Amino acid sequence: AKVLTLDLYKKLRDKSTPSGFTLDDIIQNEHLGYVLTCPSNLGTXLRAXVHV
């Protein structure tokens, strides 16, 4: 998997999806905050996990 480096982010930032969303629209949500790759990180930048 590639890491989202600043250079890669700059290349992707101005591209849009067929629906017209940009990368910034997708990773930042006004209600949830910054949406990361893991659902346990939604809006907090903290990670919660349960190990059984």
UniProtKB/Swiss-Prot annotation:
Its EC number(s): 2.7.3.2
Tissue-by-tissue expression: Expressed in rectal gland, brain, skeletal muscle (at protein level).
Keywords: ATP-binding, Cell membrane, Cytoplasm, Kinase, Membrane, Mitochondrion, Nucleotide-binding, Transferase
Record field: catalytic activity: creatine + ATP = N-phosphocreatine + ADP + H(+)
Coiled coil, from the record: none
Residue ranges of domain Phosphagen kinase N-terminal in the record: 1-52
Main location: cytoplasm
EC category name: transferase
GO molecular-function term, one example from the UniProt record: ATP binding
GO cellular component: basal plasma membrane; cytosol; extracellular space; mitochondrion
Domain Phosphagen kinase C-terminal: 1-52
Localization per record: Cytoplasm, Cytosol; Mitochondrion; Basal cell membrane
GO BP, one annotated term: phosphocreatine biosynthetic process
Residues engaged in binding ATP: R13, R47
Subunit structure: Dimer of identical or non-identical chains, which can be either B (brain type) or M (muscle type). With MM being the major form in skeletal muscle and myocardium, MB existing in myocardium, and BB existing in many tissues, especially brain.
PANTHER family per the UniProt record, alphabetical: ARGININE OR CREATINE KINASE (PTHR11547), CREATINE KINASE B-TYPE (PTHR11547:SF23)
Family classification: Belongs to the ATP:guanido phosphotransferase family.
Summary of the function given for this chain in its UniProt record: Reversibly catalyzes the transfer of phosphate between ATP and various phosphogens (e.g. creatine phosphate). Creatine kinase isoenzymes play a central role in energy transduction in tissues with large, fluctuating energy demands, such as skeletal muscle, heart, brain and spermatozoa.
Name by which UniProt lists this protein: Creatine kinase B-type
Native organism: Squalus acanthias (Spiny dogfish)
